[in-house]
């Protein structure tokens, strides 16, 4: 049975990390994807992923026409080709560590139409050093025996809310609702603003979605994914 999910991965020439990301996904979430879209920010050949992901029904392997085009333009290009109601967004440097994150995330999005996306990182990973607290609220919520936590509301200069390009399930309809991720940036900073600043894109869209009454959720404190690309950052 189809879950109506397309996985979109942004990749930037780190094929060893991409392979590890996909192997761990296939281990913990087989038979959950209708399609895998990988948008590569350069000329690399990613056809090897078809052997890593045998349960995926369809592959769409894109290569940016310009090397180092930037994450946001590539995301919007990939999203324009999504045909399913849900997107599991991911980057090329994560390791999934536990099962059922797709099913649990999907359940939360189905139950709560105002939930924008579901975080999978540990609560410790989402720590704000400047405030000595996590982005995740302390109160545990339970729905149908599934525990979840809400991400703190966005406050200017305080972070929180949680819209992110980190791994997480979200709806294609919510992306279209705001006219794409670049639209809030253009409204605030002008159409010619440098859209390669991923953190600014996340913050601006966080504020924008919160004004629409949406919130983000997180699964259990120990998390179900870990970042493996800390020392392999690609500058924009």
What are these regions (language model features)?
Residues 65-81:
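Glycine-rich, basic loop-to-helix element that forms the pyrophosphate-binding segment
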Residues 38-49:
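A conserved acidic beta->alpha catalytic loop
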Residues 20, 160-236:
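C-terminal catalytic/acceptor-binding lobe
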Residues 23-33:
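Short, acidic, metal-binding catalytic loop of nucleotide-sugar glycosyltransferases
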Residues 1-23:
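N-proximal low-complexity "stem/linker" segments adjacent to membrane-targeting elements
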Residues 99-120:
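Conserved donor-nucleotide/metal-binding helix-loop-beta segment in metal-dependent transferases, i.e.
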Residues 87:
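Short aromatic/hydrophobic "clamp" motif used to bind/position activated sugar donors
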Residues 116-134:
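Short beta-strand-to-loop element that shapes/binds the nucleotide-sugar donor at the catalytic cleft/hinge
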